[in-house]
Amino acid sequence: MGSVGSQRLEEPSVAGTPDPGVVMSFTFDSHQLEEAAEAAQGQGLRARGVPAFTDTTLDEPVPDDRYHAIYFAMLLAGVGFLLPYNSFITDVDYLHHKYPGTSIVFDMSLTYILVALAAVLLNNVLVERLTLHTRITAGYLLALGPLLFISICDVWLQLFSRDQAYAINLAAVGTVAFGCTVQQSSFYGYTGMLPKRYTQGVMTGESTAGVMISLSRILTKLLLPDERASTLIFFLVSVALELLCFLLHLLVRRSRFVLFYTTRPRDSHRGRPGLGRGYGYRVHHDVVAGDVHFEHPAPALAPNESPKDSPAHEVTGSGGAYMRFDVPRPRVQRSWPTFRALLLHRYVVARVIWADMLSIAVTYFITLCLFPGLESEIRHCILGEWLPILIMAVFNLSDFVGKILAALPVDWRGTHLLACSCLRVVFIPLFILCVYPSGMPALRHPAWPCIFSLLMGISNGYFGSVPMILAAGKVSPKQRELAGNTMTVSYMSGLTLGSAVAYCTYSLTRDAHGSCLHASTANGSILAGL
């Protein structure tokens, strides 16, 4: 009869029958009996004696995302795991005032990326060990703690010396990096199990975080002349937004819509979606003998025990009554997968999505070569510290637009995406011309860096989102969480290399701060600057 529990539908046997058109003996494996029966209904096979089984759990309608609430929640999830880091680097005016003559923004960027790379590698290993929501919750807590600590102890109470505060801020950025990256990597695996538009929603949320933080910094700086007070309010607003994202996640994870999609890949390991409590069975019907055998791949039987003595085996007599039952799934203790199995799972996924992995890595490598490091050091004698704030705001806003454009239904091939991502390398020499030669750059007008930042932001948002969105659809449902985590590893690899290269550009801006004699008088008011 073939091995029990196999996943193929065996051909019916017609040998030795009086009529070749009558099936006398047939065997079905696992839940494929229902699939065959459903197909048979449309062809009128029921009249020829083919048994039909139906399961009401399979007819459950797909829940609706009413009022796009789940999409909005996923957008805020994207806000939640980039908002803390953006909060640290967007108050660039406060950092330059408190730590003059230092590479604080470069140090924060490199610290964040190095810790984030380690975190995403660890999360990729633990994806089969720790539950999804455990990782996300831990990420939120690790992001909220440092934000609140720096707001109260450093910005408000100023409990530390300059050197201590410098080190503590870097440590806070490292803690935020670990928490937010575990959270980010988990969310991409999370949304990979949902329809594609929700991955795009998370990536749009990343850009929304930048836009919200840039607007928050501009408003607090305009409304509160005192730099310390404006920075404190700025950080407290960030804490409130992060807390809102966390609370919304706790609500959405229990919604019918999310549970419908996130439990399907889990159930597919057991057979068909929706049959989560069963463990599969085999049906064998011999018309000549009048027997119907139901077998289940139960644990190995004792040597002296017959298969028909197993509780997973049932026979009906010649009366023709069919029985269906599921044997409860045995409780199996979850154990660590072997190192070879981990590598094999990732290799299988990477073979399918390699072009998307390279595309997203190249996109973020080029971006991190320039943002936030080099962009934060661009100066103008009239606009002063307002210019880097405006440039970063333009980038965040255009990145937001690019990620919205990523929702357009364009059929990209992976190699074409990779080629377009590589073309963005042209932004590196263009931005260098905005700061070099030091004190008298070739493109000294403030409009140039704003235009380049606009174009770089749109292309970063688009080509940083499309590969992530498409990758999850190229693998099977049970591989989507792993594909999301693997794409995040590529994403973080690009960020890490880009941050390392960005340090090479710091020497180009080292003397730019003293090139403007009147820059300090222009920083007090945006009206005076314009």
UniProtKB/Swiss-Prot annotation:
Q: How does it sit in the membrane?
A: Multi-pass membrane protein
Principal location listed in the UniProt entry = membrane
Tell me which residues are glycosylated.
523
**Result after altering residue 375 to Q:** No change in adenosine uptake
* Record-annotated site: Essential for cation selectivity: 206
UniProt-annotated stretches for the region Disordered: 1-21
- Mutagenesis or variant effect for residue 336 to A: Loss of dopamine, serotonin and MPP(+) uptake
> Which consequence is recorded for altering residue 163 to A?
Loss of dopamine, serotonin and MPP(+) uptake
Q: Which residues lie on this side of the membrane: Extracellular?
A: 1-68, 123-139, 188-231, 373-381, 438-450, 510-530
Q: What is the effect of changing residue 206 to Q?
A: Loss of dopamine, serotonin, adenosine and MPP(+) uptake; gain of uridine transport activity
Please summarize the record's notes on activators and inhibitors of this protein: Activated at acidic pH.
Q: What else is known?
A: Does not interact with nucleosides, nucleobases or nucleotides, other than a moderate activity for adenosine. Mediates the uptake of neurotoxin 1-methyl-4-phenylpyridinium (MPP(+)).
The free-text function statement in the UniProt record for this protein reads: Electrogenic voltage-dependent transporter that mediates the transport of a variety of endogenous bioactive amines, cationic xenobiotics and drugs. Utilizes the physiologic inside-negative membrane potential as a driving force to facilitate cellular uptake of organic cations. Functions as a Na(+)- and Cl(-)-independent bidirectional transporter. Substrate transport is pH-dependent and enhanced under acidic condition, which is most likely the result of allosteric changes in the transporter structure.
Q: What is this protein called?
A: Equilibrative nucleoside transporter 4
Gene designation:
SLC29A4
